[in-house]
Amino acid sequence: TQADKLFEGIDLSLLGDDLQPDRLVTAEDLARDGLAFPAFYGDDMLLPIGKTPAYLGQAVAILIYHDFARFRFAKDKLKFREGTIKYGAQTGPLQRDPWGTFRYVRVGGDKPFDDDRFSSLKDTPIFPISMKKHLPVWPEGREGGKLDQEGMYYAGMIADELKTPPDEWLVMSRRYTTQSVDTSALEPDNANGWFDAETQTLHLVVPTQSPQEVADEMPRMLAKRNPPVKQLILHPCYTVGYGSKDHFNFPYYGAVAAMYGDGHPVRLANDRFEQFQTALKRHAFDMNYRIAVNRQTGVLQSFHGEMTADGGGRSNFTPSVVMVAATAAQSIYYFPKSDLSAVGLASRAIDAGSARGYGTLQSMAATEMMVDELAAELKIDPIEFRLRNVLKSGMKNTQGAIPAGAIRADEVLEKAAKHEMWLQRAKRKAEFESQHPGKRYGVGFGCVQKDFGTGAETSFARVELGEDGRIMLHHSGAEMGTGMSTSQSVLCAQWLGKPADEAHFSVTDWSVLPMVTSGDPYVMSQADQDRLQTNPAWTPSYCSPSSASNSAYYFSHSTREAARLIFDHGLWPAAMAIWQSGPGGGQAAPLVVRREDARWVEGGLTAAGMEVLSLERLAKQLYQMGGIAGAAVHVFNRWQWAEADFTLSGNSERLPIDGLAVRNAGGEFKTLPRNQVYYPPTQRNNAAVTYYSAVGTLAEVAVDIATGQVELLNHHSIMECGNLIVPELVSGQLQGGLAMGIGHALHEYLPLYEDGPGNGTWNFNRYHLPRASDVAVWKQTDDILPALSETDPPKGMAEVVMIPVVAALVNAIADATGHRFRDLPVRAENIREVLQ
């Protein structure tokens, strides 16, 4: 569909009589039968006649066939045919207000550790008071006024200072743009469904990163049908999406197709052309940055950033993507003053949503390119310049929040500065260029730290120990190729001595622990939270999708806490009962045996020199004693964990969970009401991020001055991500993220509008995904900082790994050619234009 004319219907005469669909579903059918998208996805699941499409390629009808052969022939006949859709009057594209707008202003104290004069966490983020010509109108700045007015007063102060800076300041202004890309998940969107009209039951198999969202929203959608669907039997399955299958609308199209399948099972599945045409895209960004630095000290002073992202024609996660982009733009640096705003525009492009990197890829890569240019202007080594300005533990981010734990980006920088690729770069450049006439050699560096989590992270986990010592795990998280099904199983070993024997993921039935939610965890008032939390089953958010690099830290928390409860209230009492059995208190009596001395060793559990007890023996004892053999927990994190008091074994315990059910040996699960709950204050939403993991990447390139072709000779990454649960999975994430970052920097590109994927003609014949030959597959190396201790939590790192290589490559090209590119991707034709 074109997005500048009225839609007037479809013409299927090209199919003749033999290839007409057995069922044609249009917007009129959906309206008659009461079927519509959940509110999150907006209006017009299928476009009604007489309306202008909201975006290029918007769906207008579903054609259903009872046999595959006719379907295949019909599909081939219609593909790439423009006459099938009929248009009316020219209207121009729809003009709409932005999908989301955010602004974060901070003015720190005289020193980094002093109290802020103004910040989002201490005071408030700033939101527009209205829209004018579809652009935000900000509050009037006023010292001592309302919080948002005071914020704008400080924003004005920052702008004035950058306009007329002190003599010792260097102020640099640059514009950066990044492209729209397809996440290129190699499983296209699909759904298998069957509607049993006799029982009014819909069976649906869908690959999704957010099974709980489908399980929650789809029954509501189907309940409004005329007549209502009585039951949904949902089968979420493993998938791969890189974000594109998180809160995506395809499952709802699959459900609708099944509803009109005339009793037949229906498969709705994109081919690769259709996947390019309809799948969620990464947001294209346009960024204007202004950064001030003290010329004498080389210390950053102020950062003003304005970003716009193209959110496409249907709002998805655009508001949170632009929010995350703004709050991440500082990268690894401390800025005493900052004013960062981001706007997510509505356009006629394909809808953009969650994609690996989630706005930070765009904003942080730009910061890293600019920092390199500032270092060159000041004639300071780029890594030394970074070290002078790196955010250190206890310093505040641009929202005024202190990040969690030790910030170790400085260690990453110090390690990179000592790497031979960096130390030998001048010598290698001279040698390479003398041996390869016609090629230019360059080395570049980038280092970022990215948040993991969303500020409303929730999950369920249920762990059970059988009398035979078998461990069973149920988890709400979805496996999407990251290996979380392996890592969550492995985590059980910390408390139970071995990985889970049986594990289930994308679990949507949590009747063993009934929790309820209401309100929006991001915008609710403190008064509302205080009122709602008096219900012991209430939680601010029910269940998170697999997204935001959340499995290693957040999903692991629920798994570990469930396993810990079985150890504390089942296995440890069982172990003590065995060790203390016999005359005079048994083998334990002569020694001091504490729970904190417990260790799993080969063969079982020991503590303070006690006999090693196998898990099977412990389980048998636990079941004889009737201890806790199963625990189901719900957890919530708003940049810190919710805690609650529960009565266990007659004692009150405060646990970092907000819901709990336990199963005693031989019994059924029983929900334990919490006595008191301690949710993080709603003001903590303004922190926007507190958890970080850091990665630095060195890249070595050769540029052919005749063709502009960039050859990636080698790259080395240094990562800090706490304790590794499964090192092989971390390595896989690092290598895969690097490949995606290389593609973003050098190869992948989609036009946004009429020439882009919305026209249905895009496939991998036109879209260059990086291959092994593009990523230095046999030469790349990595270095992972050891954890500070065995108690360090694992950190989410699946997104951060793809970001620094983008800046490293662009900085390396600048080192090779002498020209700084600011628009991504940097392709051969862009380099040829400059060199010739």
Residue ranges and their predicted role:
Residues 107-222, 390-468, 683, 697, ...:
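Helix-loop-helix junctions that connect adjacent transmembrane helices in secondary transporters/permeases
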